[in-house]
């Protein structure tokens, strides 16, 4: 095999995106950025548009990229992007984002030329910075909305008012990532895989935080509030395990691990309390975001057992056992809360198997999340016998039968939710129809079964909750996926090839 000594490529791109809305027949005049929903033109059978729509967004991008390769052994790539977004204030609309990466294909070196069982071996290293403007319009410039009530001289009057609090100092959220990777293919491409380890950091995080009223009109405002660190690795291994004339078996396994931590969230001592529970019976918030706290931890009281009357006992801030409520004194105060558990799985696994025998094919897809916790609002709200109006769970009279108290926000409701799931099974048989008709080459009859079975010791309804964002790990009361078990679905079909 011969390869060119040198190869290079370069490109540059200019990109512009505009988003506009128009309406007319407004009932009033003299208001700046129009409230799209007030004009009647779009509501008279031509189109519908809710009040408060964002009228305009604009994104401009200048992009350049260059690649260089020497004998398909050493590869370098560089890119630069300058982007401007109308979502930010006048002084912060433009951001510069770049990336640099390199690769070394070791398998093309002379010292591996005679190693027959190595088909491909490559290492990669890259670093890059990207920007995020993923929020709605109108956070930096005043927008108005009709038909709301606003206080005027102590009297609530209908009219125009601001859609949200504005922050003219908003700027791009930036994510930087350092990545090292290894790719390999061995034994005539019968075994392949890759490994990646990464370190990501998000600076100037965009997040909507609580705002004081007054002086602000609304109770939240968008801010750049801090930085987030993200570390992890990903591993994939695949193999063409059995290959014969009539039978073939291939499989691939994917493993990943990720950990996130808030490095900075405003000044020291600043925090954000998150995840408010439903009313009635709202016991407070279950997550606290602050400096040097791992994402996924719960901020709740630590369960210390029950007293002889079935009342809650907790650990206070000094790890001493105290009653949750002692007469008229309540120990359910923020300083007695603890950071406990973690809702981010230590390992996320997926494993697929494919079998082919003559005209038959069978595939099985497995998934697993290992060593993570879930806070079940469902158990907390519906799992106590004395909440007779709400109680619908058998556990109120079995697992929780000794609790004679009202619900409190404690780690009693947190369970290890590790699971192994048979996600899907596909079985098919292909009929060769070419000798019967010239119009149809083949027909494949298939049966697909989804959500086949879940193996877990989790005490809630569904261990597979949302594990993304800053508040992962909750089985919510008002979420359909949490309130009802997953159903197994069967699909029988025919696929024709013409």
Q: Predicted segment positions?
A:
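Conserved SET/PR-domain catalytic core that frames the SAM/AdoMet-binding pocket
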Residues: 252, 335, 345-359, 423-428
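A common structural microfeature
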Residues: 359-361, 488
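Short, exposed "boundary/linker" segments that immediately precede the start
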Residues: 1-2
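Surface-exposed, extracytoplasmic segments of Gram-negative outer-membrane nutrient-acquisition systems
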Residues: 153-163, 201-225, 259-344, 352, ...
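Extracellular/periplasmic, surface-exposed regions of secreted and cell-surface proteins
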Residues: 8-286, 414-498
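Predominantly transmembrane beta-strands of Gram-negative outer membrane beta-barrel pores used
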Residues: 12, 99-101, 352-354, 363-365
């Amino acid at each position: 095999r011969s390869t060119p000594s040198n190869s290079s490529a370069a490109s540059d791109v200019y990109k512009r995106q505009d988003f506009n809305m128009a309406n007319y027949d407004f009932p009033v005049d003299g208001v700046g950025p129009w409230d799209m929903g007030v004009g009647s033109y779009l509501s008279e059978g031509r189109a519908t548009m809710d009040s408060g729509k964002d009228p305009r967004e604009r994104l401009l991008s200048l992009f350049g990229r260059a690649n260089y390769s020497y004998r398909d052994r050493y590869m370098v790539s560089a890119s630069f992007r300058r982007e401007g977004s109308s979502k930010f204030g006048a002084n912060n609309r433009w951001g510069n984002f770049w990336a640099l990466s390199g690769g070394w294909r070791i398998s093309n070196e002379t010292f591996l030329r005679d190693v027959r069982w190595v088909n491909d071996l490559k290492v990669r290293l890259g670093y890059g910075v990207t920007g995020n403007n993923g929020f709605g319009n109108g956070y930096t410039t005043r927008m108005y909305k009709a038909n709301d009530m606003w206080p005027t001289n102590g009297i609530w009057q209908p009219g125009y008012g601001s859609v949200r609090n504005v922050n003219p100092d908003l700027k791009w959220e930036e994510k930087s990532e350092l990545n090292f990777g290894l790719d390999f293919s061995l034994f005539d491409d019968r075994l392949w895989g890759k490994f990646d380890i990464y370190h990501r950091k998000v600076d100037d995080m965009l997040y909507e935080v609580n705002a004081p009223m007054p002086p602000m009109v609304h109770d939240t405002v968008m801010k750049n509030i801090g930085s987030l660190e993200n570390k992890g690795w990903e591993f994939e291994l695949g193999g063409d395990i059995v290959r014969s004339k009539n039978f073939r078996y291939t499989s691939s396994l994917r493993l990943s691990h990720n950990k996130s931590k808030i490095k900075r969230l405003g000044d020291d001592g600043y925090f954000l309390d998150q995840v408010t529970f439903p009313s009635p019976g709202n016991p407070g918030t279950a997550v606290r975001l602050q400096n040097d706290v791992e994402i996924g931890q719960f901020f709740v009281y630590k369960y210390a057992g029950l007293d002889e009357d079935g009342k809650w006992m907790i650990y206070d801030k000094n790890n001493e056992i105290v009653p949750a409520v002692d007469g008229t004194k309540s120990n359910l105060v923020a300083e007695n809360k603890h950071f406990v558990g973690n809702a981010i799985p230590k390992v996320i696994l997926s494993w697929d198997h494919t079998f082919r025998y003559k005209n038959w094919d069978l595939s099985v897809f497995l998934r697993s999340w290992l060593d993570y916790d879930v806070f079940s609002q469902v158990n907390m709200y519906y799992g106590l016998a004395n909440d007779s109006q709400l109680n619908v769970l058998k556990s109120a009279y079995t697992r929780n039968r000794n609790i004679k108290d009202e619900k409190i926000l404690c780690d009693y409701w947190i369970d290890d939710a590790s699971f192994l799931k048979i996600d899907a099974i596909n079985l098919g048989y292909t009929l060769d129809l070419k000798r019967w008709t010239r119009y149809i080459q083949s027909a494949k009859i298939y049966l697909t079964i989804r959500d086949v079975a879940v193996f877990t010791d989790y005490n809630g309804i569904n261990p597979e909750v949302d594990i993304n964002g800053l508040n992962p790990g909750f089985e919510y009361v008002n979420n359909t996926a949490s309130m009802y078990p997953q159903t197994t679905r069967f699909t029988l079909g025919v696929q024709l090839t013409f």
